[in-house]
């Protein structure tokens, strides 16, 4: 079963194994045209409910348990970019949310070496501590569907700034929304594995740190979250107990 303390190579191997079998299972359950059919269904619901707004829509939930003992809950998600009245724009990305003793979200990716043209697995991990702080500072219940909705609404995959912690170790800073930041570190045993460890909003930041990131905040405000936030795909969530409030 997936555990955040698992060595990076074993962690990526297990996620990759589950990813392949989960994709096969979804195709078996929903048919070979699942993406095409779901795009049409989501487009119809989306245009009816949020034709003039920029929001994400979460659809039905499916549960899958892998042979490795991981339980995944799958959500359909769509978002409309600003200025596109009835057009959905997205890329095929998957997020894996797992809880087996702890809660976490996974974004498996592939990194291509430009010199050798070989692919290497990489993974962005949102840890349990991040979600605890995210729920606490957003004043929403931990391990709830409301927290999932809030997390999905504020996802931002692009690390806008590299910084250092108090010990001089490199960290990555993600702008989650207009008032909050997520802080991540690269694993020492594998720099392609990034752990997002905590969340801070501006009320929890010192004046010096807030001033330090004013330029970042202004950049996000100017960008309008256009870069890596518009996407369409399945969100896969794993949980050992109840299915996030269902």
Task: For every predicted segment, state its role.
Residues 1-246:
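Ribonuclease/tRNase effector modules and their secretory precursors
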